[in-house]
């Protein structure tokens, strides 16, 4: 029977299917749609498996979103945001706050060079059209 080979898309948008990536993916700790390997951070988004080297991640934080359906109580979902070069490159949605907290805790333990928490972006000055 046809066996599907694992392949991953990297931050440079290129596909890889190297044995080092596959072995790290198979041995990684799985939390929701995220896997934390020894070499790479793996996540799924729209059916595509992505890998990110840990040194590519400069900052990470949790963003809480609130939804108010009609005639129902509000519910919350949690977004794990990964940042590189002041740009958010991954926005991973979780239903459970504990999953995001566990991922952040494991990242803090294993990768102390990653910064944690939200930073307000610089406000750009508006151009004056008339003097």
For the regions a language model picked out, list residue spans one by one.
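Phosphoinositide-binding peripheral membrane targeting modules
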Residues: 37-73
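Generic preference for well-ordered secondary structure
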Residues: 20, 25, 36, 41-44, ...
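Anionic N-terminal interaction surfaces
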Residues: 1-38
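Short acidic/polar mixed-charge low-complexity motifs
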Residues: 32, 48, 86-88
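His/acidic/aromatic-lined binding-pocket segments of jelly-roll/cupin-type domains
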Residues: 33-34, 51, 81
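Acidic, Ser/Thr- and proline-rich intrinsically disordered linker/docking segments
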Residues: 2-3, 59-131
């Amino acid at each position: 029977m046809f066996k599907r080979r694992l392949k991953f898309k990297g931050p440079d948008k290129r596909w890889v299917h190297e044995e080092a990536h596959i072995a790290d993916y198979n041995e990684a700790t799985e939390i929701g749609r995220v896997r934390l390997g020894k070499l790479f951070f793996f996540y799924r988004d729209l059916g595509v498996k992505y890998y990110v080297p840990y040194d590519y991640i400069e900052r990470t934080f949790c963003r809480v979103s609130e939804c108010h359906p009609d005639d129902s109580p509000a519910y919350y979902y949690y977004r794990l945001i990964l940042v590189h070069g002041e740009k958010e490159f991954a926005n991973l949605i979780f239903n459970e706050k504990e999953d995001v907290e566990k991922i952040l805790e494991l990242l803090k333990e294993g990768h102390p060079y990653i910064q944690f928490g939200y930073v307000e972006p610089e406000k750009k000055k508006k151009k004056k059209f008339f003097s």
